[in-house]
A protein has these predicted regions:
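Alpha-helical segment of the N-proximal tetratricopeptide repeat
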Residues: 4-24, 28-35, 51-59, 97
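Structural signature of tandem alpha-helical TPR/SEL1-like repeats
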Residues: 103-106, 110, 142-144
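Short coil/turn linkers that connect adjacent helices within long alpha-helical scaffolds
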Residues: 35-38, 75-79, 117-121
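Conserved alpha-helical positions within TPR/SEL1-like repeat arrays
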Residues: 8-15, 44-55, 82-97, 124-139
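Amphipathic alpha-helical segments of tetratricopeptide repeats
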Residues: 27-31, 70-75, 109-117
């Protein structure tokens, strides 16, 4: 499976096909990647479908995919790696979007600790983390 082609096809679908067809494409491609044990592709596509479900306000599906993604990350022993932190940041953002503030906060802390061990202090990854973290505090109405 070619991830670049999969993502190009996915991107090309927006504006030309229905949201249902786009979701079906992601689900079917995730299933195929699992069948072929292409877990790097599975992780990428689970991140994509979490964002898709977040943007289309499909809470139950998003949370199910968040759980599945976290299980795969642990199964593959990716804890402490940057790609693990990136996926957790995506999950934390989904949790925040659906009002699971404490769960989101816990994941932001894990992402920060991972970044402290893996990236330079001035790395742009921190900007994304802290921007999303600040949105969490705003939504929690915690301004202190």
């Amino acid at each position: 499976m070619n991830l670049e082609k999969i993502l190009a096809q996915y991107d090309a679908m927006f504006g030309t096909t229905s949201l249902e067809e786009i979701e079906d494409y992601l689900v079917n491609t995730i299933t195929e990647a699992k069948e072929k044990s292409e877990y790097g592709i599975v992780i990428t596509l689970l991140n994509e479908i979490i964002g898709f479900c977040r943007d289309t306000t499909q809470k139950e599906k998003a949370l199910r995919y968040c759980e599945e993604l976290q299980k795969i990350l642990k199964l593959m022993k990716l804890e402490g790696r940057i790609d693990y932190a990136t996926s957790l940041l995506n999950v934390a953002n989904a949790y925040r979007a659906f009002g699971l503030f404490e769960e989101s906060l816990g994941l932001y802390h894990i992402v920060e600790e991972t970044y402290k061990k893996q990236v330079a202090p001035n790395d742009f990854m921190y900007a994304s983390l802290y921007n999303n973290w600040s949105l969490l505090y705003q939504e929690m109405e915690d301004y202190v």
